Amino acid sequence: MCIRDSLTNVFFVVADNIDTKGLIRLGNERVVEARLNDAQFFWDKNKTKNLVKGISDLKNVNYFEGLGTYFDKTQRLRKLGSLISDELLISKEKVELSASICKVDLLSELVGEFPELQGVMGGYFASAQGFDKDLVMAISEQYLPTGSGSRVPKKPFSITLSLADKIDTLVGFFGLNQKPTSSKDPYALRRLALGCLLYTSPSPRDRTRARMPSSA
């Protein structure tokens, strides 16, 4: 748990019965401790696995039928990111590198055990391996915003990777006619489209705006 961006060892559990003997608390403490021990084990094991060397391993992980592997997706992200970087006047090389390694954390046991940490752990792995802070943040924030009220990336490199990822997903799924309907949106395409609009629409906030590249 975090309080004001600082870690604390406090956690909350909701129980239906009064825990007079502390057994419910003890049981949940053991569960949390076991999960944290798992996380520590996987972190120690995964953090030194070279992200750049892991790029080719993405060829063995399918993304979606008709859209290739995660390696194929990262190559599309490189091209899209390069186009967007021209609009934002930022380093194309750094954008292409972040796009190449941004999905490698999906290969880790840590993300396999805690899938909700995808992207976040990629950022931590990149930081542990000495990548610069712009690239680390871009990888960490690639899936943002995640919904209404979610934090929105503001740094140019983060915007570039996040926007490229959303554009690729939208174009790919619509190209396969996997469109949302009035009752179903299994791939959260509406959320992704709204996320793109947050980057490209005028806003009173001090946020870098990305202009959609014409070839996108």
Name each model feature, range by range:
Residues 1-3, 203-206, 210-216:
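Positively charged, low-complexity/disordered segments
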Residues 4-201, 205:
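Amphipathic alpha-helical "coupling" segments that flank catalytic cores
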